Each structure stands twice: as structure tokens, then as C-alpha cells.
Amino acid sequence: MGEMENIIYSIYHPTILVGFAIGILSLLAIGFQKNDLHALILTDVVECAMLIIIAGVGTDLAEALILPGLVVSLAELLAVSEVLITRKYLKSKRPKPKSYKLFEEFKLPLYTGELKYDIHMEILKTSPKFLAIILIVYGAILSGFTGGAVIATGLLFYALSQRVIGVEISEELKTMWEGISGLSGIAWALWIFGFIGFFVFPDKWLLCLLMAGLGLVIKVGSKLGLIGYIGEVR
């Protein structure tokens, strides 16, 4: 047991130095980088370097911080990648490839030669809203990182289902969705304050827990939900 502790202590300082070195070098490389794709990859490298520093602490709290950090960084990477792909597509002005949608069996050829939906099922319009509301409410009850992921799943399911059945999302909902995504920075600050409050005000642990949980819900839910919003705009 003593030898294992000595090994852990011996690699702590090199781990912290390696993490800081990778982060600083990646930030310098981003400053000199002109390619958007390379800058995106380097940004993800910086996030991995910060996770290395957190992992070097080797405590249960550090372990709890690694998973939310990985998922939030992945959500940001996917969202920015969607923006870059869309911008590249608009610049290239290439013909849009044919997209295949669900419910192809409900499409019947008309005299004009076009394929249009020739069926009206109420469940196709109401069930996505019902399932999305259930997921959002359940995610709000869970709170924290897991709750944010469940809420994001409900938002993505609603956006994708509306696109599949050919129904456009209302402008009011798009505006509200964009506003929630804009609260990402505020949610992150709320989570930081709640996290610090555990140590500064231990007697207020319940309030700090609710603050941290609410911050993670908004942060993760808005980031993952942004993917469906970008796809709808595109």
C-alpha cells in the first residue's frame, strides 16, 4: 500500500505540469491557426488538458467532475462542427444530396409526379410533444448532469420528429430555444458558485446543491438541444 501511494505522489507533479504545458501550447497554436477545423481540434485538446489536471487530483470529487466535462466538451464540439459543416456547404454551393425520411410508405405519387404525404394521423403530431414533455419534466426532477442529458434528449426528439413529418417549428419556439442556449454562460457560472459554496458555506449545502444541479441542467440541456435547433435552421 505504501509503494502504491509513493507511485501516486511521484506522478502528481509531472501530471500537472504536462496538463498545463499541453493547455498553454494548444492555446498558442490556436492564436496562430487560421484553419477553423484545426482550431476546433486544438480547442478540444485544451479541454482534454484541463481534464488531465482534474484527474491528477485523484479524488472522488475530481472523478465526478470528469464525466460532465467530457460530455459538455463533446456537446460543444458537435455544435461547432455543425456550424462549420453548414458554412462549408453554403460556400461550396453544391447540390444538396437526396435525403431519405421516415414514413416513406405513406408517400403516394400524384399526377404532378411529386411525392407528398397523403395521410393524416393525429398521433404523428401529438405524440412527439407528449414524449418530449415527459422527458423534460423527468430531466428537471433528476437535475444535474443526468437531468440535462434527459432534457436534451426530449428537445432533440421533438426537433427531429417535427422535421421528419414535415412540420416546421414555430418561430416563437425557435426564439425561446435560442434564448435558452444563450443562458449557457450564466448556467456555467451558477454551477461554479454552487460548487464553491459546498466548501465556503457547508451549512448551506442544499442550496448549493440545487444551484449546481440547475446550472448543469441548463448547460447540458441547452448545448445538446442546440444541435436540433441548428439542424432545423439549416
Curated annotation (Swiss-Prot):
It is a multi-pass membrane protein. Keywords: Cell membrane, Membrane, Transmembrane, Transmembrane helix. GO terms for cellular component: plasma membrane. This is Uncharacterized protein MJ0523. Its main location: membrane. The keyword Cell membrane applies. The lineage of its organism: Archaea, Methanobacteriati, Methanobacteriota, Methanomada group, Methanococci. InterPro entries: DUF2105_membrane, Prd_NiFe_hyd_3_EhaG. Pfam families: DUF2105 (PF09878). The chain crosses the membrane at residues 11-31, 52-72, 131-151, 182-202, 207-227. It is found in: Cell membrane. The keyword Transmembrane helix applies.
